[in-house]
Amino acid sequence: MDARSELHHYNPYRVFSRSEWANLRQDTPMTLDAGEVSTLRSLHDRLDLSEVEEIYLPMSRLLSIHVGAMQQLYYAQRRFLGVVERKMPYIIGVAGSVAVGKSTTARVLQALLARWSPRPKVDLITTDGFLHPNAVLERAGLMQKKGFPESYDLPALLAFLSDIKSGRRKVRAPIYSHLTYDIVPNKFAVVDRPDILIVEGVNVLQTGRLPRDGKAVPVVSDFFDFSVYIDADEPVLRDWYIRRFLALRDTAFHDPRSYFHRYAPLSDEEATATAIAIWERTNLANLEDNILPTRPRATLILKKGADHVVDSVALRRL
């Protein structure tokens, strides 16, 4: 095989079946019980002890290796420079489509990593809090593109991550309400020098356009030390979104404060048609144009089947 043929067949990822990946857990202890696992599961997602044991414990072991290597590099560089600097937080990005289960993955990782020995401080934020308020999106004609890159206050998100990496104390992140579908005024989550920060959002692996003047333009993923992309085929994602919409119609949408309260009286047929329209107009377009193209930038890709269970894992080669 010549060099060009080898290059053509090169895969930057090592791909593991579920059973192969599960074997990489080795002796990593299970630190969560069934009750704790159930509280980490998002609406209409699937998560049980076997999923944690076979998928997330090997991830925890891998991350402990990466974090340990980063710490060794930090101390080696500190000796090399002859300076004493505060160790920077290790930042993990979690990306993927709407309805794929990013929140579940992020919460499971937070719970497992926080129980490492010694106990690190592990914080979690979602980029939803950095969406522009609805009033701003409405003025800009962007309500139908909520979740697209242009709907975020990118300078605020980049400033937040820069403050975290520089070791600033008590950095504030805006809070988003899925009930009102808007930023909560004057309420913030405070992140105070965590050892590990998990950042979850649909577009966290997004790249920016190259500037004409040649000046460097930071992107969110520049601050990540490790990234995870949760993947599933589009028809599967569409079905999950419809099922979630129907479940919310029967629960949260009945709250008069809900932005989607008007959908609560819909029949199954009407609600399904509405969910399909929203999916195709907004979420599918965002997936195809902005989210899926970022998948090759992830360190680790979890591929889910129709049953919400991870059936293969791809790890980027070093």
Swiss-Prot record:
Gene: coaA
GO biological process per UniProt: coenzyme A biosynthetic process
Name of protein: Pantothenate kinase
Pathway annotation from the record: Cofactor biosynthesis; coenzyme A biosynthesis; CoA from (R)-pantothenate: step 1/5
UniProt KW Transport keyword: no
Main localization, broad class: cytoplasm
Keywords: ATP-binding, Coenzyme A biosynthesis, Cytoplasm, Kinase, Nucleotide-binding, Transferase
Phylogenetic placement of the source organism: Bacteria, Pseudomonadati, Pseudomonadota, Alphaproteobacteria, Hyphomicrobiales
Protein family per UniProt: Belongs to the prokaryotic pantothenate kinase family.
Keyword Amino-acid biosynthesis among record annotations: no
Enzyme class, spelled out: transferase
Location of this chain's protein in the cell: Cytoplasm
SUPFAM superfamilies listed in its UniProt record: P-loop containing nucleoside triphosphate hydrolases
One Gene Ontology cellular component annotation held by this UniProt entry: cytoplasm
Binding site for ATP: 96-103
Source organism (scientific name): Rhodopseudomonas palustris (strain HaA2)
Catalysis performed (reactions): (R)-pantothenate + ATP = (R)-4'-phosphopantothenate + ADP + H(+)
A GO molecular function held by the record: ATP binding
Enzyme Commission designation: 2.7.1.33
